[in-house]
Each structure stands twice: as C-alpha cells, then as structure tokens.
Amino acid sequence: MRELNFRIFIILFFMSPLLSFPLIMYYIYLQRKYAYTFLALFLGFVALLYAPTHDLFRHNLLYYDFAGESISGIVFRQDVLLYTLIAWFAKWNINFEIIRFLFVFFSYQMYFSLFYSIQRKNTSLNNKRISFLLFLLLLFSIRFFVICCGLRQGFATALTFFGAYKLLVENQKKGYVFLFLAPLTHLSLIIPVAGALIVKYVRLNFKLGIFIAIVSYVISMTFMDYFSSFLGGDIGKTIELYTSGYWGTSGEAEGQISLKGRIALYINQLQMLPFIYLMYKIKGKNSYFSFIVFCFILCFIKCFIKVITLLPC
C-alpha cells in the first residue's frame, strides 16, 4: 500500500476520521510519528460521542453550576486542575465536551509518545511486526472508559507514567512538572508520584524494589484508615472511599463486578510477571531499570488493594 500525500491524508482525516482509521493504523505499522498523534485525535473524537455516565455525569452537572457563578481564578478544592478547567470553560461558555476531548487526547498522546521514544531507542523494535504487536498490547491495555468517563484519574495516571519516564529514563527536569500536575488532577496519584521520586534518588535493586512494594502495600492496608481519620475533611473522605469505602477492598464496587469482569481483572494482574522478568534481566545501571521498578511497585499495589482504576492497563 502506497502512502498518501500527507496533505491529502490530513484532509481525509478531518472529512471522515472513521474512514481514515485503517490508514492511521497502517502508518503506525510503518512507524510514522505523526500517525500516533492522529490516533490520539481519533480517540479524542470518539470520546466526544460517549454518553455522560458515572463521574462524567457529575462533572457535567458541575459545569452548569459553575456557569451561574463568577469565578475568575483557581478553584481551590481537591483535584484542582479539572475543577478549575470546568469553571473557566463554564465562564467562557466553552462546551464541556471539549474538556473530555482534551483529557483523552493528551492522555493517549503521552502514552504513544512514551512508546515511540522507547521504540526509537531500542534497535530490537526496528522489526515493524514486533513493534506493531507491542503497540497493540499497549493500546488495548489503556482503559478508554477510565479516561473518558472518569477524566481525573485516567489523565492523572498518564501524567504520572509520562513524568516518571521523562525523569527516570531521559533524566529530563520537565518530568517534575508532569509529576507535580498528577496529584493536582487526582489526589490518589500522590503515592505513585512519591514512589517515582524515591526510585529516582534511592539506589534500587530487585530485592529493595520488592521490599518497597510490600511496605507500600502494608501501609496502604494498615494505616490509611488512620490517615483518613487524622486528615479529615474532603481528603480524609477520599482516602476512606478508595481504601475501605465504595472503591476499596470488599467495597460495594467490588461486589458489582461480574464473573467475566473478575476474570478480566485477574488476567490484567498478570502484567506483573513481565516486570519481574525484566527486573531480573536488566542491570541496575540501565536507565530503564528505575522505570521498570517504578511500574512494578505500582502494579503490586494495584494487584492487592484492587483499586482497579489506578493504572491504565
């Protein structure tokens, strides 16, 4: 299949994103960088069509509440980034769906940018078929529903992974910016962000990585109730909600998961196995080692506390 002229491709995409989708995937197979951006745009357009359910419905109602208020600055409340954007969009009479589009687009763009960077740095991924299969694994492991309908946690998770990669692998200071924005988008990401900073400044090996993961699990299961009582207010209520409340272990949300959903959840947790393998095979001096340890710690926490929306996969 011959490549279309780039300008013709752009015209075709904006005339019919759906008809151009096969071309987008073909150009991704050819490892064209621009194709990843167009796929992120396509998924952003799909998000515009999604019915407002779950958290998205509440955020939509909040948009209309803010429309009747005179807000000119930052909305100082938990998850400040989203609520400030909602307030500004309501004030300027910009459609709420644009926020949904932006969160989905930038989330996927960050994941795809991370994948493309790894692809460029590893000669073993020059094989188009292997690289494309790995990309499909990434694409289908990112939970579109979490980003589109939850907005905050899905986007915050993308910020955390992207920031951790920039900081731990590429040693770029702008990684701190993304890690700073993550808990401002969703408070639950403050622990993974702290984990990324620990991995950055503490020399880790496999055993120490396992130890930190176990300690993180014990702390999350044992002391979070005390933290929620001590902190009180909205932050305390949120911690309780995600640890022992609706979204916590044995919470109401877990009871609503069907048999097929449980099977999918447990299969998802098998993602820890390749991380363990890579931690054994890759030496600690490798720039990827710290990032792999960071990912493993997050997967370990996710596996046991069952906060199923913590990671995109």
Locate predicted features.
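Transmembrane signal-anchor helices characteristic of membrane glycosylation enzymes that use polyprenol
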Residues: 9-54, 215-222
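Alpha-helical transmembrane segments and terminal signal-anchor/GPI-anchor hydrophobic tails
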Residues: 52, 57-61, 66, 83, ...
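Short hydrophobic/aromatic helix or loop-helix immediately within or flanking a transmembrane segment
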Residues: 57-65, 72-94
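Membrane-interface helix caps and helix-loop-helix hairpins in membrane proteins
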Residues: 94-97, 142-152, 305-311
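Transmembrane-helix motifs of polytopic, lipid-linked glycan transferases
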Residues: 102-123
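Membrane-embedded helix bundles of polyisoprenyl
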Residues: 129-150, 154-161, 188
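Membrane-interface transmembrane helices that cradle and orient dolichyl/undecaprenyl
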Residues: 160-174
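Membrane-interface alpha helices of multi-pass inner-membrane proteins
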Residues: 174-197
